[in-house]
């Protein structure tokens, strides 16, 4: 397995698909990286030679990926929560931040349903 940006990229996949195993690289960015380095997108990762892998590593190093990207996203969310703005409050409460309805739905964000408490006398 080729190791790029601290991630083992699957050998059996095409280069453009294999690069998506790296957090922060999707299909469009993987396509642009392959075009910029001159690596064929249909070439399997196991067939890449060392010079092509080095070109890919250099090109990917220009982007924020993996741990740095995760850290940046979590710091942005933490900043919103510290500001106390609407989006920060929604993050703090574990509710959707982008205007979705919550009376029904929003189960992914809210978690499993809590059973209704019966009234005791």
Swiss-Prot record:
Could you confirm whether the keyword rRNA-binding appears in this record? yes
Biological process (GO), any one: translation
Tell me the SUPFAM superfamilies matching this sequence: S13-like H2TH domain (SSF46946)
List keywords of the entry alphabetically: Ribonucleoprotein, Ribosomal protein, RNA-binding, rRNA-binding, tRNA-binding
GO cellular component terms, A-Z: cytosol; small ribosomal subunit
Q: Does the keyword Methyltransferase apply?
A: no
What this chain does, per the entry, is described as: Located at the top of the head of the 30S subunit, it contacts several helices of the 16S rRNA. In the 70S ribosome it contacts the 23S rRNA (bridge B1a) and protein L5 of the 50S subunit (bridge B1b), connecting the 2 subunits; these bridges are implicated in subunit movement. Contacts the tRNAs in the A and P-sites.
- Give the protein's recorded name: Small ribosomal subunit protein uS13
Supply the gene name.
rpsM
């Amino acid at each position: 397995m080729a190791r790029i940006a601290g991630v083992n990229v699957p050998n059996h996949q095409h280069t453009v698909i294999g690069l998506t195993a790296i957090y922060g690289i999707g299909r469009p960015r993987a396509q642009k990286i392959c075009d910029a380095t001159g690596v064929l997108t249909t070439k399997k990762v196991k067939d890449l030679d060392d010079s092509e892998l080095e070109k890919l590593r250099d090109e990917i190093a220009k982007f924020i990926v993996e741990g740095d990207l995760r850290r940046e996203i979590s710091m942005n969310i933490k900043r919103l929560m510290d500001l106390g703005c609407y989006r920060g409050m929604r993050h703090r409460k574990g509710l959707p931040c982008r205007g979705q309805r919550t009376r029904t739905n929003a189960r992914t964000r809210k978690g499993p349903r809590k059973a209704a408490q019966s009234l005791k006398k």
